[in-house]
């Protein structure tokens, strides 16, 4: 047991001694396939500016962390999942999903799947995106659910509560926020989560809020 403890301690120390990860600023781009453009148009047409920027930053954080972890992933799937992962928080998302879920993440997954079906996306790809969106509120999303789901969760977690914030160089963190400003993200998201908790007391949002999620948002390393 002592050897195992020393091994884990050594891994932590090695991780702490690694320099923060970064990428070239010109690699921070939004993919421009027809499906990505359509997803981006849907996002901007139904979401407030702060939520649009959150979804775009989620994608960029996800791609940066994917490079850090040396992951191979489908860029189009990851972008569409990131762009639409909070669709359940919008009026259009609720209509597309036909109100079938108690949780906004699951409702967003239904809505995204309906949007993808309208654009002729194959069943398997629709299912991968829908599952990634449905799972993004979980505490952890292991790789067994797909690299895209794992990275979407990581990107959203970084943007919302600052998870893995210090793993990235300050320069690249600043560049992402410069490209897509936070626009009072903390205050806006806290208000929205409280609203979700009241409207859907059995949802994951309500569960998370009852277990310190609001405080985690407010005390993340981001300024706003």
Label each PLM-derived region with a short phrase.
Residues 1-23, 48-52, 56, 60-71, ...:
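Divalent metal-dependent phosphate-bond-processing catalytic cores, especially two-metal-ion Mg2+/Mn2+ enzymes
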Residues 14-15, 22-23, 29-31, 79-80, ...:
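Short, flexible segments with low predicted structural confidence
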Residues 24, 35-54, 88-96:
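Active-site flanking loop/helix segments enriched in acidic
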Residues 27-31, 50-57, 70, 74-79, ...:
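Short, contiguous, pocket-lining structural segments
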Residues 31-34, 38, 61-66:
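Auxiliary, metal-adjacent structural segments of Zn-dependent hydrolase domains
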Residues 33-37, 41, 49, 123-127, ...:
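Generic alpha-helical secondary structure signal
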Residues 77-179:
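Divalent metal-dependent catalytic cores for phosphoryl transfer on phosphate-bearing substrates
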């Amino acid at each position: 047991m002592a050897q195992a403890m020393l091994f884990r301690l050594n891994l932590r120390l090695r991780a702490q001694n690694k320099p923060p990860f970064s990428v070239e600023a010109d690699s921070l781009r939004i993919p421009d396939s027809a499906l990505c453009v359509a997803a981006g148009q849907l996002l901007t047409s139904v979401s407030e500016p702060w939520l649009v920027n959150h979804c775009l930053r989620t994608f960029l954080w996800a791609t940066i962390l994917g490079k850090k972890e040396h992951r191979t992933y489908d860029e189009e799937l990851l972008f569409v999942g990131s762009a639409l992962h909070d669709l359940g928080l919008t009026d259009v998302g609720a209509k597309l999903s036909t109100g079938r879920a108690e949780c906004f993440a699951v409702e967003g997954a239904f809505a995204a799947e309906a949007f993808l079906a309208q654009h002729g996306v194959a069943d398997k790809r629709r299912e991968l995106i829908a599952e990634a969106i449905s799972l993004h509120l979980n505490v952890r999303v292991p790789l067994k659910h797909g690299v895209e789901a794992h990275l979407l969760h990581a990107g959203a977690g970084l943007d919302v509560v600052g998870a893995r914030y210090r793993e990235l160089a300050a320069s690249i963190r600043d560049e992402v926020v410069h490209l897509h400003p936070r626009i009072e993200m903390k205050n806006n998201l806290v208000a929205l989560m409280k609203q979700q908790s009241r409207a859907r007391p059995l949802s994951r949002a309500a569960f998370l809020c009852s277990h310190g999620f609001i405080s985690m948002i407010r005390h993340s390393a981001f300024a706003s």
